[in-house]
Amino acid sequence: MNVYYEQDADLKHLQGKNIAVLGYGSQGHAHALNLKESGLNVCVGLRTDSSSCAKARQAGLEVNTIADAVKWADIIMILLPDQYQKAIYETEIAPNLETGNTLAFAHGFNIHYKQIVPPETVNVIMIAPKSPGHLVRRTFTEGNGVPCLIAVHQDYTGNAKEQALAWAKGLGGAKAGVIETTIKDETETDLFGEQAVLCGGSAELIKAGFETLVEAGYPEELAYFECLHELKLIVDLYYEGGLSRMNYSVSDTAEYGGMTRGPRLITPAVKAEMKKILEEVQDGRFAKEFIDECNSGYKNLTSLRESNTNHPIEKVGAKLRNMMSWLIKK
């Protein structure tokens, strides 16, 4: 696996180019502002009725409609939600592409699952910061950066990789390290991680732990602190130094209990289910399910959101967080 740093990337591959960032959400604002402050020529493409137009202009960015931004640009970064990209690509992006343009993405979903099939006469690249947009922005303003993944899906001009590296450098990512991968690997590992560990597995583990304590007669407040609130302290240790750092930092009692009881929870049956989840990502079943869900008006997702919001851990959590002055503003 190739890893690149600042000396391996050169902004000259973007200098003199017109760069359009489509979208101004978490990632969009970070990409647009970081590249602009890296000395590049950037505009933001948004719907005319978007509430983000005023925010982008207030930040000193030029704002155009999506279609006009694409017409103007040499390099187009699509940072719109996955489920909207296909329709906007077909109606506002594809008709305005020119030979030699570069299409860029921060996640490979629509390319990998062929929701978007660009013409062969354009570059297709990915630059994926491994961090939420607000951290991409904050670390840049502090003179640092977050690690990025890059991938080249199509190289029409012969310098697509150089453009991707330059973009990562403009974001600040080359200070932390830029890892070269493929659209396929980024998409499949990203989706699996979200579903099995980060957003799915961890949330269900938290709820199950909370429910177990409450059903055994313990106060909801104690269950919340033990199963959700303190998780941040543990995750911070993982983040800073891996599993070993966590084990070193906790008590011997906690370390022994975790090492002997953890495997009783994450059994071979759980790992087998993880493999099934990965297979659904790999063969496109999850992508089809999600696209069908979007087309149905999010009926299942709406119900799941409501159920999650009404879970007792959310009610007691809101009450307890109101006691934590450092969290109120967030």
UniProtKB/Swiss-Prot annotation:
InterPro entries associated with the record: 6-PGluconate_DH-like_C_sf (IPR008927), KARI (IPR013023), KARI_C (IPR000506), KARI_N (IPR013116), KARI_prok (IPR014359), NAD(P)-bd_dom_sf (IPR036291)
Pathway the protein acts in: Amino-acid biosynthesis; L-isoleucine biosynthesis; L-isoleucine from 2-oxobutanoate: step 2/4; Amino-acid biosynthesis; L-valine biosynthesis; L-valine from pyruvate: step 2/4
Binding site for Mg(2+) 1: D190, E194
Domain KARI C-terminal knotted: 182-327
Active site: H107
Co-factor remark: Binds 2 magnesium ions per subunit.
Gene3D superfamilies linked to this entry: 6.10.240.10, NAD(P)-binding Rossmann-like Domain
Domain KARI N-terminal Rossmann: 1-181
Transmembrane segments: none
Protein's job: Involved in the biosynthesis of branched-chain amino acids (BCAA). Catalyzes an alkyl-migration followed by a ketol-acid reduction of (S)-2-acetolactate (S2AL) to yield (R)-2,3-dihydroxy-isovalerate. In the isomerase reaction, S2AL is rearranged via a Mg-dependent methyl migration to produce 3-hydroxy-3-methyl-2-ketobutyrate (HMKB). In the reductase reaction, this 2-ketoacid undergoes a metal-dependent reduction by NADPH to yield (R)-2,3-dihydroxy-isovalerate.
Protein name: Ketol-acid reductoisomerase (NADP(+))
Source species of the chain: Prosthecochloris aestuarii (strain DSM 271 / SK 413)
Gene that encodes the chain: ilvC
